[in-house]
UniProtKB/Swiss-Prot annotation:
Keyword Hydrolase: yes
Catalyzed reactions: 6-phospho-D-glucono-1,5-lactone + H2O = 6-phospho-D-gluconate + H(+)
Biological processes, Gene Ontology terms: glucose metabolic process; pentose-phosphate shunt, oxidative branch
Protein name, per record: 6-phosphogluconolactonase
PTM sites of type N6-acetyllysine: K287
Free-text function comment from the UniProt entry: Catalyzes the hydrolysis of 6-phosphogluconolactone to 6-phosphogluconate.
Organism (species): Shigella flexneri
Pathway(s) the chain acts in: Carbohydrate degradation; pentose phosphate pathway; D-ribulose 5-phosphate from D-glucose 6-phosphate (oxidative stage): step 2/3
Amino acid sequence: MKQTVYIASPESQQIHVWNLNHEGALTLTQVVDVPGQVQPMVVSPDKRYLYVGVRPEFRVLAYRIAPDDGALTFAAESVLPGSPTHISTDHQGQFVFVGSYNAGNVSVTRLEDGLPVGVVDVVEGLDGCHSANISPDNRTLWVPALKQDRICLFTVSDDGHLVAQDPAEVTTVEGAGPRHMVFHPNEQYAYCVNELNSSVDVWELKDPHGNIECVQTLDMMPENFSDTRWAADIHITPDGRHLYACDRTASLITVFSVSEDGSVLSKEGFQPTETQPRGFNVDYSGKYLIAAGQKSHHISVYEIVGEQGLLHEKGRYAVGQGPMWVVVNAH
């Protein structure tokens, strides 16, 4: 298995393309100049395209991915109704979902043969909308509205329209600020990192009564931390054993172990990392974590080691200016 790592650097308007080898070393293979400040990125389910959101002219760009080395070639673009904060797709590659923090909306862009062709729906009134996350069964779109301390729940219709579910939302504690989410591989639990109080919530997708319930909340910061809390990103290993979340003020990654059924997180330790880590990701093998420092303009690669999933630094690399997003593709 070959793996490619893509790093989005909006301040220099670049995507750096790296080969990740089996020992965790990166080799730079391409630098793409992007027509705008590139921020969120996601790979299509069939691994043929990389979708990126750019500003100040709000668009989603599609880059064709070369199957041999992961190199990018521009393929298409489509206008968006707000500044793109987060970008994702459904599991069948029919739609792109874009959350916009500044516009307070989530939009759905239709894909034809992998290329974006236009917005088919927009839901407004989501103050601080920070991500859009499709459930493993491809039925429910979870959309955190950070400023409203709620996660809105939508069914995605066959034509891409978002229909509010019943109940239409779940709520966090006041002042939490739900931001980014991941799902456990067993499809029974979701995990949400809360930006404003730097905590992680565990959501049981369906309890015995068919309800969605928050079953655990964990503080992700060290006990003696007294500065401003400013959590950013969250990711889980492919086997579901280890979960990671980062805080930008403290410039650290918190390491969690996950119970076998996915219902309980245990805090295992902290890894100091690049300055102001806005984004990171875990590779397909579950062996390596790549973190980007928005203020250090570097990325670091860590090996995931032991039963606790602690991080051991393998290498550090200069990238573009203000790196914010890390995406890994396998081919």
